[in-house]
Amino acid sequence: MSCIIKSLDGDIVYTAVKAQQKEPEKGNAMRKLKKQTKIPAGIKPSYYVGLRRSSYGLSKRNSADEWWVIRAQEFAGMIAGSVDSGYVQPLIVHIVSGYSGDGGSVFEFAKPKGYTGSTRGMVFSVDRGIDHEKALAAYDENGVQAIIQFEPGNSDMLANIEIAHQAFGHHSCIIGYGVDAEWYFTKESKDETGLPVKDEDAKKWMESILSHNPEYTLFIKHWNPSRMPRTYRHPNLWYLSDSQIFPDLDSLMDDFSYWSNCMKEQVVGYQFGYPNDKKWWSAMHNPPLAISKRILADIPRAKFLFWVDFTADEVDFR
């Protein structure tokens, strides 16, 4: 079963069942993606691979939606060519709100006209760099999925979910929502790394998300396992680590493995490629592939892999 991606450089053929890959010639920085083969209905991907995208991570590419689509697909295709079986789905963690210094959250889109609930701790600003409606439409058209992420501060997470779903829930690319817990009641936490997410709160968020679509997923992200729900588990819930600042790949893997061990019975995911780790990953041949292969080999419950936007223009995903 093949996923065929056509570009100006030629055809790129990625096969997930048999690890075969036809490499294109490199050199065309503005590659164009014409078609993405869809995963057959009823079959769930083995892995989700792509990019983190925020308005502040790589601002010079804020309006270049096709650029993000192409690289998410290329990264997923590259991983598909390195695994033994299954499908690899291109996915973008799409961040629509940012933590505010006053402890609240800034939404990068207009409040939906039909929304009448709480807006405590929220500011709505449409001029923040990314046209989220346009970006999500580009994902829809090209077979790239998205999870909407919040940096909620002290705003109500249930309200965050409802507002975003009213604004963007019509997009077929969306498969769920996520929260960066480092920015969850950050100002109220002693070390300003966010308050721990309580089991009962995670359960409420999960139930809210599933009320919109029973197939939707929820991720909770942090670098410190102590900030995660202690006992709450759900098949549609997964935990995402954005840990960074390591001296080498082995140290990163020790931390990532510890994260997985702490999240017993749950699927896990990882963000990597941070500038703070560039000293060692930049010395690798094909850093996205090398790091991903190590994660998948060492951590069986790792299903979600993302290169961060901060350095997404400094590596090749082919």
Task: Show where each model-derived region lies.
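Catalytic domains of carbohydrate-active enzymes, especially glycoside hydrolases
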Residues: 34-102
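Hydrophobic faces of well-ordered beta-strands that scaffold small-molecule active sites
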Residues: 45-51, 90-94, 146-150, 175-179, ...
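Aromatic-lined substrate-binding rim segments of carbohydrate-active enzymes
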Residues: 100-151, 201, 205-216
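An active-site-proximal structural segment forming one wall of the substrate-binding cleft
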Residues: 127-141, 153-176
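Aromatic-lined carbohydrate-recognition surfaces of secreted/lumenal glycan-active proteins
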Residues: 144-158, 206, 210-229, 267-277
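Substrate-binding cleft/loops of secretory-pathway carbohydrate-active enzymes
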Residues: 155, 159-166, 224-252
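Active-site cleft segment of glycoside hydrolase catalytic domains centered on the general acid/base Glu
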Residues: 159-163, 167-171, 178-214
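Substrate-binding cleft of secreted/luminal carbohydrate-active enzymes
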Residues: 244-318
